[in-house]
Amino acid sequence: MEINWNQIETKWQAKWNESKDFETNPNEKPKKFITVAYPYPNSPQHIGHGRTYTLADVHARFYRMRGFNVLFPMGFHYTGTPVLGMAKRIQSQEKEILDGLRNVYHVPEEDIKTFVEPIKIADYFHEEIKSGMIEMGYSIDWRREFTTIVPGYQKFIEWQITTLKESGKIIQGSHPVGWCPRDQNPVSQHDTMGDVEPKIDDKNHLVKFKFGEYIFPVTTLRPETIFGITNLWVNPNTTYKKIKADDEKWIVSEECAKKIEFFGKEITIEGDIAGTEIIGKYATALHNNQEIPILEAEFVEPAIGTGLVMSVPAHAPKDYQALMDLKAKNHELASKIEPVPIITTEGYGEIPAKEICEKMGVSDQSDQKLEEATNELYLKEFTDGKLNDKCGDFQNEKVQFGRNKVRDWLMENNHLEKFPVLENAPVKCRCGTECVVKVLNNQWFLNYGDEEWKETARNCFDEMNILPSKITTEFKEVIDWLHERACARQQGLGTKLPWDKDWIVESLSDSVIYMAYYTMSRFVNDETIKPENLTKEFFDYILLDKGDASLAVSTSKLSEDVISMVKKEFQYFYPVDSRHSGRDLVQNHLSFFVLNHVAIFEKKLWPQEIVVNGSVMMDGAKMSKSMGNIIPLRTAIRDYGADPIRLAIISSAELLQDADFNMESVSGIQSKLESLLEECSNLKASEIGDLKAEDKWILSRTQGMIAQVTEAVEKMRLREGLQDILFSFESDLSWYAKRVEAKGRDNVSGILHKINSTRVAMLSPFAPHIAEEMWEKLGYTELASKSVWPEFSKESVDATSIQSEELLKS
C-alpha cells in the first residue's frame, strides 16, 4: 500500500488542532512538565535540529497516554547579536550567506530584501520553524508561545536579573571574556559561526624577565617551574615589537601586542627588534636575579603567547628535546646548560623529561610523540609531584597546591600577571570577525565561580535524574571550571538591565528559568494580564511565595482571582519534570539552567530531570553548508513524510550517540509502515473465543513487548523501544502465522486485531500521524493519541505456553 504521507499528516494535524488535546490546563490528574530548548530563529531548522524536538515530543506523548496531564510548550529565542551580524552580512552582499539563503533554505527573494532589518530575519524564521514543528506533529501547547523580546517576557527577565543581583549572584568587576572587536560585544556560543563556545583559559600567566631597560614577558601554565628555568627560547625568524605597556617597556611579538590591547593596558609601539638581535644574550629572572641565556628555537610561534618561551628541560619534554638538538650541533651556549630538576615524582628519576622522551623514542623536536609525552608527564607531576629543595619556601609542597602559592607569591612581587587566552582559537563571530580575549572592566557578571553556589548546584545534579547517566560527570566538570560570566552586553536584541539601561541581558542569561514563564504566558497572550501588570511583587508572590496576595494585587492592579489563578497554575506545573537539549549545551545552557534554578527557587521547585542527546550526521558526515548535505526539515517532510523522518532519526542511534541519518533507512521505514497500515486495514475486531496454545503464547509475547517497550521509553532508550515495536516482534508474529497455518486455522483476525491495536498504540508517540491512520483502520473512533498506553499484565502471561512453544521451536 503506497502512502501519501503529506495528505495523511495534514488530515491528522487538522484533527489534533480541532480537538485541542495538547492545550493543557491544571486538572486533577498528575502532571508532567516537559520542555526543550527554544530555538534561535536565524535559519530554518534542519534534520539535525529535529532530533532533540522529536525525542521530547515522544516523551510528552508517552506520558500523556500514561494518564498524565502533560504540558509541552514552545517559545522563540530572539535575544542576542546573531541576527544583527547576519543582517550586516546580507547588507554587504556577502556571497556565502546569500547563497545559503537562496540555494539551501530557498528563501524567496522578496523576503531576503527585507533581511537588512534584523527583526525581519527573526520573524521570518520564527514562522518557518513553527510551521516545521507543526508539520512534524509536535504536540505543543501553542497558546503559551512567546518570543524573548515581547514586553511580558522582558518584565519577567527584569525580575529574574534583579532577584539574582539582590542575592549577590550578579557582581560588577573585571574579567576576561570572548570578544568581537567589530561588534564591540562579548560573544558566547549563540554569537559564533558553528555555535562554538569561546573557551577562555585564565590559568595562563606572564612571568617577567629583565632585558636591559625592557621586560621579557613569557607565558606559562606552570608558574612553579620558574625554579627550573635554564634558558629562554626566541624565534630567529620573528621580528619582535618594542612596546610600552602602561608604565613598563616590553618586548613581545606583533601578534601579542595586538592581543594585550584588549587587556585594558595602554599600548604604545616604540619600534622593532629582530629575534637574531636577542639570541645569544642574557635576561635576568626577577625572582632570584639569575642570568638566563637566550637561545634560538624555530618551534616558537609568534602567534602563541608572547612569542617568547621559557625552557624547563628537566620537566618539559619539548624543552628537553630542543636542548638536546642544539647540543647535538655543538651549540656553544647550549653545551653549558644542564636540566635543573625541581619536582620529584614517584615512578620517575631525577630528569623526568629525559626519561619519557627516551621511553617514547622521541627523535627530535619535530616528533609528534612530544605532545603525548608532554600531556602524560604534566598530568603525572600535577597529581603526584612534590617541589624539591630548589624551590625555597615551597619545598615539599604538592604541585597541585604549590602552583597557586608560587603564582600568588610572584604576583605580589609584580613578577607575574594574568594572560588569559582563547583555548579553542580561532573562533569567529557571526559577523565574520575573529574573536579575541578582552578583559572587561565595570562589566556585570554572574558569579558562577562562587563555591557555595557551585555546591548547591552539585547537590541538585546529585538528586535529579540525568539521562543518559554517564553524562553526569560532564555536568560536574562544567560546574568545577565555571567562573564569572558576562551577563550583559551593549548591543543586540533583548531586555535592558533594570539598573543600568546601557546594558542588555545576554542570550545565555535570559534563557535559564524561562520555563516558569510558560505557566503564565497564556494569560499574557490572551490579555488577561498586561505587561504593565507584571510587577516585582507579582512575580515574588507567584514564583517565590513571598509577600502576600494583597501586595501583589495592589501593585499589579490585577484582581485577586486572576492572581490566584496564575499562582495555582505555576504551583501545579512546576517544577520542570524533564528538560531536553543537545549535548552541545551541557557546557553552558543546561548547566546555567540548574545554577539559576537553585539560586532563585526553593528546593521543591528544582528541575527533576535532564535528557541529553547527541547530534545528527548525514550519511556518516557532519552536516554543513560547505559539504552541501544540509536538508531543511520542511523540505525533508515534503519529500519523505514527517513520520518516516521521526523514525529514521530515532532508530539510527541511542540517546547520546550521534545519529546517522540516511535515505536508505527512511525508505526502509516507509516500506515497514506501509506494510503495517495495510495489515491494519485488513483486520476487524471480532470475538476471540477459546484460546489455543499458540494464541496464549503470542498474547504472552505481546505482554513481554509491552513491558520491554514501556521500560525503554521511560529510560529514553527510544531506539530500543521502536525496534521492539516494529521489528523484533515480527519474528514472534511469523512463528504464530506458521503455527496457525499448520493447524489450518483461518479465524485469528480477532487476536491479530488485539495485538496490532497494542502495537499501534505504542507506535503512536513515535509516529503519530500514521498511527492515527492505522488506529482508524482498526475501527477506533477516538484518537490514538488519546488512547491509554498498554499496561503490562502479569496475569495475561501464560508461562506454560511460552515453555511449550520454545520446545517446539528448538
Task: Annotate each predicted stretch with a short phrase.
Residues 2, 11, 15-19, 90-227, ...:
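Residue patterns forming the tRNA-binding/recognition surfaces of aminoacyl-tRNA synthetases
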Residues 8, 13, 166, 170-192, ...:
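Amphipathic alpha-helical
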Residues 16, 77, 168, 323, ...:
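Residue-level signal for inorganic ion chemistry
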Residues 24-88, 148, 157, 218-221, ...:
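N-terminal catalytic cores of NTP/NDP-binding nucleotidyl/phosphoryl-transfer enzymes
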Residues 28-30, 38, 73-82, 145-153, ...:
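Short, solvent-exposed turn/loop segments enriched in Gly/Ser/Thr/Pro and often Arg
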Residues 39-74, 96, 180, 194-215, ...:
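Conserved active-site neighborhood of enzyme catalytic/cofactor-binding cores
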Residues 71, 223-261, 408-448, 666-680, ...:
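Structured, non-catalytic alpha/beta "coupling" segments that mediate domain-domain communication
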Residues 223-308:
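Protease-associated
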